[in-house]
Structures are given as C-alpha cells and as structure tokens.
C-alpha cells in the first residue's frame, strides 16, 4: 500500500487541483437555422457554417 513520505502543503495541494476545473462546452449557433450545436459539429438538420453538408432523409 502506498504511503506518503511528506505531507503536501495546502499550496501544493491547490496547485495539484488547479487542472480539475470543469469547462463550459463550446456551443455555437447556426446562422441559417438558429439552432445550437457543439462547435466543429454539424447541426441536427445537416448544416455546418451556414451551408448544408448533409441532405435530410426526407429529401433523399
């Protein structure tokens, strides 16, 4: 079983935890439809950066 050799000070403990913060996901708004989607992903109806890259199943 691992046992620490020296106690970690509150400062070092805080430095160790500094990378554990949660980040807000990058949400983008599609300019043509106004829908929200994750950045660098297509919107649910097939648009990416203002142009349609996938056709809808009803159109195909």
UniProtKB/Swiss-Prot annotation:
One of its GO terms (biological process) is translation. Pfam families: Ribosomal_L32p (PF01783). GO terms for molecular function: structural constituent of ribosome. Keywords: Ribonucleoprotein, Ribosomal protein. The keyword Ribosomal protein applies. PANTHER family: 50S RIBOSOMAL PROTEIN L32, LARGE RIBOSOMAL SUBUNIT PROTEIN BL32. The keyword Ribonucleoprotein applies. Residues 1-60 are annotated as: Disordered. Residues 9-19 have a biased composition (Basic residues). Belongs to the bacterial ribosomal protein bL32 family. This is Large ribosomal subunit protein bL32. The lineage of its organism: Bacteria, Pseudomonadati, Pseudomonadota, Betaproteobacteria, Burkholderiales. It comes from the Bacteria. GO terms for cellular component: large ribosomal subunit. InterPro entries: Ribosomal_bL32, Ribosomal_bL32_bact, Ribosomal_zn-bd.
């Amino acid at each position: 079983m691992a046992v620490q050799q020296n106690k970690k000070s509150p400062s070092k403990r805080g430095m160790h935890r500094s990378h554990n913060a949660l980040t807000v996901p990058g949400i983008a708004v599609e300019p043509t439809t106004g829908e929200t989607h994750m950045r660098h992903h297509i919107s649910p109806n097939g648009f990416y950066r203002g142009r349609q890259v996938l056709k809808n199943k009803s159109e195909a």
